[in-house]
From Swiss-Prot:
Transmembrane segments: none annotated. A lipid is attached at residue 115 (S-farnesyl cysteine). PROSITE patterns: HMA_2. Residues 116-118 form a propeptide. Keywords: Lipoprotein, Metal-binding, Methylation, Prenylation. Belongs to the HIPP family. This is Heavy metal-associated isoprenylated plant protein 47. Residues 1-67 form the HMA domain. InterPro entries: HIPP47/16, HMA_dom. GO terms for molecular function: metal ion binding. It comes from Arabidopsis thaliana.
Length: 118
């Protein structure tokens, strides 16, 4: 929806933007035009009559220029060709496994049969 504003000050533009953003269903609001005097409102289920009345009451005199449905761009589905599958080869290692090393610890004092405290 494109709304023509008759505003001369930045304060009125800000107020008009605030009123438009507060409306139900509005998803985006932008100022366009040579003199930043057109308010572009995009949304789902926006009531244009109530928005125009709210803008006239709270901001300034406005007129509705265009009201149109925003159409989503059509995306052409391209046929997807499957890519050739590349076989993954397993990793082969020529390295020999390392032998396990065990360390044997001997008690130099021998088995104790009693109290060692003297």
């Amino acid at each position: 929806m494109r709304i023509k504003l008759s505003v001369n000050s930045e304060k009125c533009r800000k107020k008009a933007m605030q009123v438009a953003v507060a409306a139900d269903g509005v998803t985006s609001v932008a100022m366009e035009g040579e003199f930043q005097d057109e308010l572009v409102v995009v949304g789902d289920g926006v009531d244009s009559a109530s928005l125009i009345m709210a803008l006239r009451k709270k901001a300034c005199h406005v007129t509705l220029e265009t009201l149109e449905e925003v159409k989503k761009p059509q995306v052409e589905e391209k046929s997807i060709t499957p890519h050739c599958c590349i076989a993954q080869c397993p990793v082969v290692s020529n390295e020999q496994p390392r032998p396990e090393v065990y360390r044997i610890v001997h008690d130099s004092y021998g088995p104790t049969t009693g109290c060692l405290v003297m």
